[in-house]
């Protein structure tokens, strides 16, 4: 049984007050995974630690991907959170605002990307700043309620996948220091719509993982992030796997990319 979701805002989310979409969760054969769509009221779902370990007293917010049209809620959400909780972290799965659609938003996205790619990209770019604002508010909320969650407000991390990685980057580059995480892990993230040429001073350490055969060509985004963070003198680590495709998350493919979360934990442990 999962914990009850925590709403990020007291009322309607700022900037989308008129949205009336109904959140849905269903299995899509197109992506072969469980997805959540039509999020208009963003929430955090706490996943408390299930054992003591290196993450004791630390929080990690997990942002699933899905092209800003859906959230891969298991492989890039709760499966990640459960793994982190098993080594002591207090994890939170973030449901951020998404493009509003009909009964099967994933099918609508796949069709639009086939027939009108520019329109699909425009839809994503339009909602991305709202999703980023939700990521910022999630960090603020966890810090504000740190005592309640038994976490250190100076040890709040953020892991995001694909579009969720874009959210993670927006949070990492926030102009509000109170909304910036203490460490960040954009996994096969897209940098679309974000100026990463000059990372803000005080940005926390970054962990990157991507597959060289990423079907969306996002390897170059991770390489650019690595180079930009290095040039700025910021701590960064990049794992570029030969195979894994896009969206590997916690899927078992019997490839080295399956172990990305172990490498993340190794990296985190070395932060001290």
Pin down the residues of each PLM region.
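Alpha/beta-hydrolase active-site loop
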Residues: 106-147, 260-263
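Primarily recognizes the serine-hydrolase "nucleophile elbow" in alpha/beta-hydrolase
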Residues: 129-202
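C-terminal catalytic histidine-bearing segment of alpha/beta-hydrolase fold enzymes
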Residues: 107, 223-226, 230-272
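Active-site glycine-rich loops that stabilize anionic/oxyanionic intermediates
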Residues: 64-69, 212-213
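Short beta-strand element of the alpha/beta-hydrolase
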Residues: 56-65
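Short amphipathic alpha-helix adjacent to the substrate-entry channel of hydrolases
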Residues: 73-93, 227
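N-terminal cap/lid segment of alpha/beta-hydrolase-fold proteins
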Residues: 1-53
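The feature captures the conserved acid-bearing segment of alpha/beta-hydrolase catalytic domains
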Residues: 177-240
């Amino acid at each position: 049984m999962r914990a009850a979701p925590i709403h990020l805002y007291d009322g309607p989310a700022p900037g989308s007050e008129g949205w009336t979409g109904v959140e849905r969760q269903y299995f899509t054969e197109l992506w072969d995974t469980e997805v959540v769509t039509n999020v208009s009221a963003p929430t955090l779902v706490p996943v408390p630690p299930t054992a003591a370990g290196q993450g004791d007293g630390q929080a990690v917010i997990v942002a699933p991907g899905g092209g800003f049209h859906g959230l891969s809620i298991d492989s890039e959400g709760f499966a990640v959170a459960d793994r982190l909780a098993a080594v002591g972290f207090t994890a939170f799965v973030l449901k951020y605002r998404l493009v509003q659609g009909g009964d099967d938003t994933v099918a609508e996205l796949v069709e639009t990307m086939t027939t009108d790619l520019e329109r699909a990209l425009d839809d994503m770019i339009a909602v991305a700043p709202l999703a980023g604002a939700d990521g910022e508010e999630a960090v603020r909320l966890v810090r504000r309620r740190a005592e309640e969650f038994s976490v250190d407000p100076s040890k709040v991390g953020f892991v995001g996948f694909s579009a969720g990685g874009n959210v993670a980057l927006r949070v990492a580059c926030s102009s509000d220091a109170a909304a910036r995480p203490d460490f960040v892990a954009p996994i096969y993230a897209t940098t679309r719509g974000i100026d990463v040429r000059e990372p803000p001073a005080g940005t926390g350490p970054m962990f990157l993982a991507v597959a060289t055969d990423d079907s969306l060509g996002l390897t170059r985004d991770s390489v650019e992030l690595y180079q930009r963070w290095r040039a700025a003198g910021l701590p960064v680590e990049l794992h570029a796997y030969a195979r894994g495709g896009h969206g590997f998350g916690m899927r078992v493919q019997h490839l080295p990319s399956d172990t990305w979360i172990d490498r993340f934990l190794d990296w985190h442990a070395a932060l001290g």
